[in-house]
Amino acid sequence: NSLTVADFLGSHYRSEAVRRVAALIVAFSSVLYLIAIYRGAALAVASFLDLPYAVCVLAVLLIVTAYTLAGGFESVVLTDSLQGALMLVGAGAIAMAMWRAGDGVEIFSAIRAQDPKLASASNWAAISASLAYGLAVGVKYLVEPRQLSRFYGLKDQRALRIASIVAPLAIIVTYGVLLPLGAMARAIIPPGAIESSDQVIPYLLGSAELLGPVVGALFLLVLVSAAMSSIDSVLLVAASTIDRDLCRATTTAVSTGATMRDVQWTRAWVVALSLTAALIALIPGVNDIVKLTKFSGSLYGACFVPVLVCGLYIRRSATTALATMITGTITVIGVFTLRQFGRTTMQEVYPGMAIGLVLFLLLSQRSGGGDPTADDVSK
């Protein structure tokens, strides 16, 4: 009868402390991701309408918060399905348009001429950073609450089987066409035309008119709507987790039935989280969507891949789960902070996941927790 990932982990490990720590991690990681999406959506709107960035952040805040409060989970799932299909088509269209604009394979020569390291297989720093982003976002798909909530909402086993095939295929196709775009964009975008990587897609669709003025404008709107859809998904997950697993959590199970008062409190948290993320997105120094997304994904990977994925199949212990989540969080935040101050070039996802997995496996072998039951695994 679990309604949130933190709720499930608390039940799975029979620990209220596990539930609360998991809820804190979900809330913090969600805010990081919300900030990144707010910035991305606002930049796209600013590029399309030629409005100040702050005005666009405010517009996104008002629109997405309003329809999240009005529609709830069902509206989020329906809009996500449509926007996901549009994004899949759009990703392929952008990749083909960029390939054509760069004269096919000649685009790699242009990239190499600009900077030989960009096309070098020995540029380990760049390769490590690229793989880190792919890993952080990839493992996030396995354990992120807003993704798992979609499977919670499937109506039967048949729908679950279909989703288990369609979802990985869609991810592979999207990754395959979008990940190379950053490097390919260097051959098309003139030096000094943009200030940060956050502006790559708005520039390609706007100033460069990669898909033409009409189609480019339409797809830019698709990107904005997809970003807004991501915002409402994260808002619902984070708000329900804070309300249910932090504010209302007790040593006994919380009733699965929601009263009107419960709904009102969750809505209040939706507003608070949305406003907080939007305000932080306005801070001048917060200007790297990739960095924030990778940071958020690294936290999920270091903390939840061991305790949620591995914990379904091997011996479980609340102490092990707590130690893993806390250590994983400290490792990711610590390495991320050191890199911001130039003390290391290491990507936080690598030590975070490595330490989290090794610690969980070692402590699981030494703990006296019970083995997972067949019912646990089926859940």
Across the structure, where does each feature detected by a protein language model lie?
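Membrane-embedded helix-loop-helix hairpins and adjacent transmembrane boundary segments
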Residues: 1-379
